[in-house]
């Protein structure tokens, strides 16, 4: 058996300082290849002391999945750019960004740069250095809020790579219904990823996110997204 390890590495991010990437490798058999989940907001995933909001307790979740026999996964957490988070995790190509008053100062949509970093720097490094599967049925992308928007975007841009997308409290409200409809009409192909979309509605902002998520569900159905590739 190979023991559990949590690695932190630095990878070059375009026009900014090197970015910290966390790689959690659970205990596994020697030579075993594991499914892999690429997640945004890496500093929020593993360490309660690295964020004022607490962590996702990802290690505990993976250990619980191991014990229940459901599966075993490498978790790759990509740190956000702190003051640049909103910019990094908001794509430009979907449409004109709405609700700018909610976003960071000096906001500029640069989600495509993050997507390029994920696809051409992070994933190749992980696949070359850690025991992960590379086929889409064992590769997922996941995030929340702006990170949920980004995971949705990356999954739609690269359905040949991602078989699953975890999309939590996604910032779909950043674009109009019309822009979303136009974007989806150009992206849905035969073999799309499974979408697990979830949001609450506990406060005013969450209610706005909830309503925009319902809107996106409707558009997915209107665009004939495969029903068996979405959670209800």
Task: Please describe what each predicted stretch is.
Residues 1-232:
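Non-catalytic cap/lid and distal C-terminal segments of serine-dependent acyl enzymes
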